[in-house]
Amino acid sequence: MTEPVDSAPTASAQDNAPAQPPSQPATENPPSQQNLPIRDAKTAKDKGPAQSDKQPAKGKDAPAPAAGTESGAAAGGDKPLTPAELKKKAKADKAARRAKEKIERDGGAGAAGGPASGAGQARPPATPRKDVAPGGAAQKGPKAPLLRRGSHGGGSAAVEQKKKKEDKSVAVFGHLYGQQRRTTVAGAGKEVHAAVLALGLQLRDYVVCGSSARCVATMLAFKRVVESYTTPLGTSLPRHLTTHLSHQITYLSTCRPLSISQGNAIRALKLAIADIDPSTPESAAKNTLCEFIDSFIREKITVADQVIAESAAQKIQDGDVIVTFAGSSIVKQTLLQAHHDGKQFRVSIIDSRPLFEGKNLARALANAGLDVQYSLVHGISHAIKDATKVFLGAHAMTSNGRLYSRVGTALVAMSAKERAGGVEVPVIVCCETVKFTDRVALDSIVVNEIADADELVSANAAQQVTGLPDPAAFTAPPIDPKKPKGGKSASSAPTPDPVSSERVPSPSPLASWKDTHNLQLLNLMYDATPAEYVDMVITELGSLPPSAVPIVHRMSTNM
Amino acid sequence: MPSTALALTPGLSSFLKSLKTNPIDTSIENLVSLLKRRQIRHSRSCATATAYLLLRVVSACRTSESTKLIERVQSVGRRLMAAQPREMVVGNIVRRVLGLIRDEAEDDREAEFALSEAGSESQPQTPRAFDDASMPLDRDMLGMRSDGGDRSSRPPLTSMFSLLSHPEPENSLPSTPGSQSPNARLFSHGHTKDVRAEVLEGINEIIDELGQVDDQIAAYALDHIHSNEIILTHTSSTTVQKFLLKAAAKRKFTVIIAESFPNNHEATHATVSGNIVGDDENLSFDSFQKPLIAHGITVILIPDSAVFALMSRVNKVILGTHSVLANGGLVAAAGTRVIARAAKVHQTPVVVVSGVYKLSPVYPFDFDSLIEYGDASKVLPFEDGDLVDKIDVQNPIYDYVPAELVDLYITNLGGHAPSYLYRIVSDHYRKEDISF
């Protein structure tokens, strides 16, 4: 991906003069003119994270070979140009145009935050040719160096801004950058229920966080949807409710990608809806569904958690040192249960940026009177040194036995398994079967979730917990100085005293990272822990090795 | 005490500034307190401060008797080491200076031996202008006498030394400026220089080495980084940054930086984005160049927790370190160990870049004693005071990384396997100084 960037300056240097003549025919000759978009689209596609600095150079690079091939075709193959070839060319053009449109649309969607880019590029799909041809000509012509020099200002600001926005997706994870997460309820369909609207925002802000919690909250919201649902005339409830629900689901997934547990729950709910006899009266059907939801939550989560906590607590012995990562609700329940049972043990919580979920766990455990030690990811090797057991929560268990959990879990499990010169520490995963999935994952890259990278910008730990839902404030540097002070008092706000100016720089180096070329921030949500690091998975159906996940999953879905 | 005397914030630069004016004992106290309070923290700053202080100590020590010089340096060294036992660089520099003095003393003895046979004696040259002109003569007399006495008692021992042990280090390190050039100069200039001048020159060379070490290491960058590589690193180590920058001048690759959250993330963020905000002592004395991103290198900043997730795509892990132990193990910023471990699991080579001055002759027996714990409020800020009361918050600053997790060391002398480090140790430090 970097090669063209390398070659661009040299190519442009050579081709500046020769590129001039072919540029004139380009405007009158349709094929060559259409060649341009092809190249353009291709370069744009190849280099998702292309810097806008190099953009003019690339634009210049592109027409040169295009013109070359075009002139070659004109010289050698113009006369024997068959209709078939013409057709092929036309098809290619069309494909290219389509690709370009798609890219522009994606770009517009991705850059929803920046209205300028949308305005600048909204029209091209309608008239791609007109838009590109002059641009291409301008880049080829004597204006090109000018553009390059003033690459930061320039007339093509809109284009550049769009490029910059695209820039920020890490290439390896390109497939994971979907549309940007929804920031408001604006634009949500009118059929989306108010409870779902609220839940969506809560999910997005990590107010409802954790696989089980998200699952329960979703089911409860859907229960309210079902309760307030009335079948429109001319359809039956089993047919229409599914589509009605799918609107809600789509909305939820724009707020935050659905978790495995949510997916499993929704699948079960849809099955339940499909099972309803169309002749059942509406109120009876709704009652059945509500009961189904209640029993699903009870069986799959609430009772399951109790069962797991009880059996996991039995694994804890007096004098144990339990290491856990981040804040899993089921691990919390387990530890509290063990404490309740009168076991004497110590807990070491490892936490990570940016969510600091372990803090809440630490608070809960400390309030319950447990002996808690707290450190961050950098202290893993110290925390694991005197550990006797590792308890982990799960986001999901994949069919190949991998544990898919909050990013950093794999590091903890690995450290437990590879303690230098010591006995291996058993790694125990607590996981409800509703989190089992038939998907497989070899690494953490193919399946993952990417959170807003702005969450990484603020370095202040306290803000992370309380002020998370306001990424807009972090992107705008001028607001920053007030931000950390906001919680304290109004007295410090008017005077930018030395203390504040000293504290402010900490978030500032990254504050403008979106405008910094070549700099990317990556905020992954999950990672996949290899199955060999997991000794035991405790589920409500019993304690299993990770290899038993697909079997249990099949059993539980066939029921 | 140091901060009251100076308007500057205490640190390396203020220390060096005050070194010229303050009396020796004050300077020693000054450095001791700086070390104790961790106002000097980076290994190179510590090394530089120690070297400059020893330069002052040696130049103020009005004796040319090597034993007295050694005693003086040892006593100062002991105080510095006691001030911050985990800062091994200080001990390393002291040991190297001691080694210098011993080398010079031995050479001198040999020279005396040879000269007395030849019967020729020339005026001692003092290239460095020392305050008094009368000194050289006295010193020479003293040296003569003491050496004479020495010679009568143990000439065979000296010659045995020179027969067996001495020639080896000379041959085996042709490229260390610190240890090679004094000998070379000695042979070319004749054997008449006094010990102290030679030692001072040697210390100056150590200081020069400290200044150049990053660039020397960076010179090997192109041997290790190829195009389109994905490199993972940790913290904002200047050595690593320079290494990568050197390669960035010629090649395009991708750098993933783990931010090393509580202890070094601010510096890492600043390094990554190129806007250096805090005037860190680390950055003040080397002209920091353009950041990597300005060279067209894609830099991806990740939280430390994402290391395992990304490791499968990483081609190489390049790490800086705090100090290197003689067994090839590392004492590096906390979090390094899991990164190295994750790299090992993914069969990714781990390269450690470190100046030779960080190489310590200490064999670690008690790993925990090497680890320093830092400010817990960085992990859990005081806003969570209720929580801080109830739980035990830990913020380790260093990690011990065992040698088997490291594939390659790149020092200013070149690349070495971890198992070879003991050899470099024996080249740089004399056995008698290892525990002084």
Residue ranges of model-derived segments:
Chain B
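Long amphipathic alpha-helical segments
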Residues: 2-150, 154
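Predominant activation on well-ordered alpha-helical scaffold segments within soluble catalytic domains
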Residues: 29, 48-55, 74-77, 91-98, ...
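Conserved phosphate- and dinucleotide-binding cores of soluble alpha/beta proteins
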Residues: 128, 133, 138-186, 242, ...
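Small/polar-residue-rich loop-to-helix segments that shape phosphate-bearing ligand pockets
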Residues: 182-200
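A short, well-structured juxtamembrane/interface segment
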Residues: 209-226
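Gly/Ser/Thr-rich loops at beta-strand to alpha-helix junctions
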Residues: 230-241
